[in-house]
């Protein structure tokens, strides 16, 4: 993912109001809307898609993990947060909609972490 100009993610501002997510799952609704707007697939039944589809998500997560590692090594907390946000967006949003797990992710998370 291309880097933007210097980010501060609200570190220098008052705390932003937190959104309320549908089904308690951040990023999924945003990705669903993005996909619909730009003609990308939203799957609603659990599936393993073709390799070219899941390979994109896999490669994207690896890229963001590398950016996270570099940010930690550089002591750059803003870039750490940027990488963590990208990892969450891709994992929860893209991964969930790609695999048709929108209605399954939150109950599964609660069970695994509960």
Where do the model's predicted regions map?
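Flexible "arm" and connector segments at domain edges
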Residues: 2-114
């Amino acid at each position: 993912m291309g880097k933007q100009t210097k980010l501060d993610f609200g570190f220098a501002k008052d705390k932003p109001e937190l959104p309320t997510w549908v089904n308690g799952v951040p990023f999924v609704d945003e990705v669903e809307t993005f996909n619909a707007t730009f003609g990308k697939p939203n799957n609603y039944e659990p599936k393993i898609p073709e390799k070219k589809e899941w390979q994109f998500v896999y490669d994207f997560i690896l890229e963001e993990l590398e950016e996270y590692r570099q940010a930690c090594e550089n002591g750059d907390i803003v870039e750490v947060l940027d990488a963590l946000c990208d990892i969450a967006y891709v994992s929860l949003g893209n991964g969930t909609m790609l695999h048709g797990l929108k209605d399954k992710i939150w109950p599964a998370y609660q069970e695994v972490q509960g």
